[in-house]
Regions:
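Short alpha-helical
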Residues: 11, 36-37, 61
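Local sequence-structure signature of Cys/Sec-based thiol-disulfide redox active-site neighborhoods
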Residues: 1-25
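Non-catalytic, surface beta->alpha helical segment in thiol-disulfide oxidoreductase systems
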Residues: 55-71
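Thioredoxin-like thiol-disulfide oxidoreductase module
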Residues: 31-47
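Conserved beta-strand scaffold positions in the cores of enzyme catalytic domains, especially
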Residues: 27-29, 59
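Structural micro-motif
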Residues: 45-53, 63-64
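Residue-level recognition of oxygen-bearing side chains
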Residues: 15, 37, 65
Length: 71
């Protein structure tokens, strides 16, 4: 299962979600606008930008990395 960490004002987050939807890939969205625990977790992993996308335990990265991963 894919998990995507997002913020409402993030254009690349919307693009990543659209890409997953176009590929008919199910995902869970975690909004950093509302989940401080998730924000702390990503910070501890030194992830400073959104989106951050995971396929299970595998950290894919952001939108560009997701696009490459799916190609």
């Amino acid at each position: 299962m894919y998990t995507i960490y997002t913020q409402n004002s993030c254009g690349y987050c919307h693009m990543a979600k659209n890409l997953l939807n176009e590929q008919k890939i199910d995902f869970i969205e975690v909004s950093l606008d509302h989940d401080q625990g998730a924000r702390r977790m990503l910070k501890s992993m030194e992830c400073r930008t959104v989106p951050q996308i995971f396929n299970g335990e595998l950290h894919i990265g952001g939108y560009t990395e997701l696009k490459q991963y799916l190609d």
